[in-house]
Design a protein with these regions (language model features):
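Residues that scaffold, gate, or flank divalent-cation-dependent active/transport sites
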Residues: 1-129, 134-136, 143-151, 155, ...
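Flexible loop/turn segments at secondary-structure boundaries
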Residues: 38, 169-172, 252-254
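Compact, charge-rich alpha-helical regulatory domains located at protein termini
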Residues: 75-76, 180-256
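Charge-rich, low-complexity amphipathic helices
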Residues: 100, 175-176, 256
Length: 256
């Protein structure tokens, strides 16, 4: 049976810069894009320190937020001095893609076939897919392989989450939600759920069968790589998880 490993590098644009310029790890770093009207919007970011204990939980920075809003959040969490120290760099999608392709070639140590994911819904690639069919045995099993991938990249200074499943799509979903996806074998002990960096979806477990839910049923619908409008539409009709989508019939979907 084919098996695929997805390695997700969250906030890849800023991770690439931190890898090339380690000195940036000491200061808040923003990668921004200039829009048509001259507004700077955040593409990726990194904070080297946790918020101050006295600070209330700050608003979450999301891609597309204006730089001014992001700096306001930074000031709330770390004080105004952090804004003065912040490093602001311009978006460079071509360099980001080249860096990810170079990392994909490095990932061929796990299996000969490895490549960068295709961009979907206007989002730049942040994942590497590796065809690990028949190669996991050389690493002591799939749980050991997926763990080795995350740890080896961490040793290089990269934060990565990895998952193995029957298809690239299922592995992508599990890698983006390792806190919700199956952890693998019982012996594969990790940190608490919110800290998990890898997951293994057992062969065939992603399929919905009579009397048994699919292993990824509890993941949010965003794990299907749908555009934001479709995700919002599904939530409006009460469908928040992949399991909710799988259990829908064509007739009930039309009525909703």
């Amino acid at each position: 049976m084919p098996r695929f490993m997805t390695i997700w590098l969250p906030r890849w644009p800023v991770q690439r810069r931190l890898l090339d310029r380690p000195e940036l790890r000491r200061v808040p770093t923003f990668v921004c894009r200039r829009e048509r009207r001259g507004t700077m919007t955040v593409v990726s970011w990194a904070w080297p320190r946790p918020p101050r204990p006295a600070a209330a939980a700050p608003a979450r920075i999301v891609p597309g937020m204006s730089l001014a809003e992001a700096l306001a959040v930074l000031a709330t969490a770390h004080g105004s001095r952090a804004c003065r120290l912040a490093e602001i760099d311009h978006d460079d999608p071509a360099a980001d893609l080249a860096g990810l392709e170079q990392l994909a070639r490095w990932c061929r140590r796990f299996a000969p076939a490895a490549g960068v994911e295709q961009a979907v819904a206007g989002l730049e690639p942040e994942c590497i897919h590796v065809d690990v069919s028949g190669t996991a045995c050389f690493f002591g099993g799939e749980a050991a392989l997926v763990r080795t991938a995350a740890w080896t990249l961490a040793a290089r200074g990269l934060h990565a989450r990895s998952a193995i499943a029957d298809t690239c799509a299922a592995a992508w979903a599990a890698a983006h939600h390792t806190d919700l996806a199956p952890p693998g074998s019982a012996a594969d002990v990790q940190a608490p759920r919110q800290c998990r960096r890898w997951a293994v979806v057992a062969p065939g477990a992603q399929r919905l069968e009579a009397g048994r839910d699919a292993a990824l049923s509890g993941l949010p619908v965003a794990a299907l790589r749908l555009d934001a409008a479709t995700v919002d539409m599904l939530r409006e009709v009460g469908i928040d998880t992949i399991g909710g989508v799988l259990r829908l019939s064509a007739k009930s979907l039309a009525s909703r």
